[in-house]
């Protein structure tokens, strides 16, 4: 999980004089791909000075806030990139750049995606406009307000003594395992979601839930809530079509992942 307290970042919705300077960070996306500098071998976001040389069309532009005294912006663009820049998915920069950069890029992508999917009112179909105060879209025809979408989800580490439960999603390659995770359904508490997801995916009951922490997870717009839980009862039965295999693994048999 990346830093829980990003003290150096101040969220802002209204632009201020002196924010959009030459060193302002531009998290610019073409589709869901981030435009990065490639000269150093480490993916880095572009700056306002860099962007001046781009011959692209800006479809959306949003102030995110101030990070270490520098303005941060999210942009949606269309067009060709100049030499020395590349398009990279966010998963491609995870582990290869500072976690603060990944956090801000994820925040930017969710903002751009929200803009792209809320151009028209979901209630009456009229065009949406920017809300004058909040980060929101306002329908001036019927008054409907659309805020950025968040999909709460849980991820849980189930333990039994010195062993932990790992599972492989049916869509993943052989050898790729993770802890269990799933989305919160309407009307559920997050604790109920933990119990339901574990039962659905592997047929086990758990107990002694302990909240661990949360993080934004921009794939595409999740708020991930982490838990520890202890095995209570049952035998592993993998959910058909969802879980290919699941097993208990000793901590001592785990190896640390390499950087992407």
Report the location of each language-model feature:
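Hydrophobic alpha-helical positions that pack around
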Residues: 180, 194, 198
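N-terminal alpha-helical interaction blocks
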Residues: 1-97
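Conserved small/polar residues in nucleotide/adenosyl-binding loops
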Residues: 252-260
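Active-site-adjacent beta-strand/loop module that shapes the phosphate/pyrophosphate-binding cleft
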Residues: 215-240
